[in-house]
Amino acid sequence: MWKEKKEARSSRKFIFLREERYQLQGLRNENYIEAHLKVSCLIGESDQVRYMVEMPVYKQTNEDGMYKWVGDLHELRERIVFSLNENGQIGVIHNISEIQLKWDEIKSKVFLRHKNEKYRNMLIKGIEKVLSNNDQLAGALRFAMPYLLLSPGIHSREYKKNEPVSGYR
C-alpha cells in the first residue's frame, strides 16, 4: 500500500524558467516558459520509491500553432506519479488511468478550440495513442522539459570512457 501524499518522505519546490529562441531562414520564434513544480518522494511497501511531480502553474508567452496545444494539454501533466527505470530515467507512470480520465474530460474542449486546424484529428489520435500505452507515455515524458532535468539518468553514476550511454541523443 502506498502512503498518502501528506506522508511523503520529502518534497521540494522548483520554479522552471526557460527562454526559447529559434530562427530558421525566414521563420522566427520566441517563447518564454514559467512552470512551478513540487516534486515529492513517496515510499511504499518494501521501500519502493515513487516520485510525484505536481505542476499547478504553467505559463508560456507563445500561443501560436503547436504551442497552443501545449498550453491546452497542460492539465494532463498537472500531477504525474512515476518510478525510475534502471537508467535513472522515467520508467513507469503509475497514475496513467487518472491522466486518461482527465483526457476524456478535456477532449471535447480541446477538439472545439482547435476545430479550424488542419491537423487536429491527427494530433488527437496521436495523443490517444500515447495515453493508451504506459511505455509510450513514459518515453514521451522522459525527454520532455522539465522532466528531463529532474531525472536525466546520466548523473546517477560514472561512465567509463568508451561506454555507450543511452540518453537524449
Segments and roles (model prediction):
Residues 1-169:
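Signature of exported/secreted
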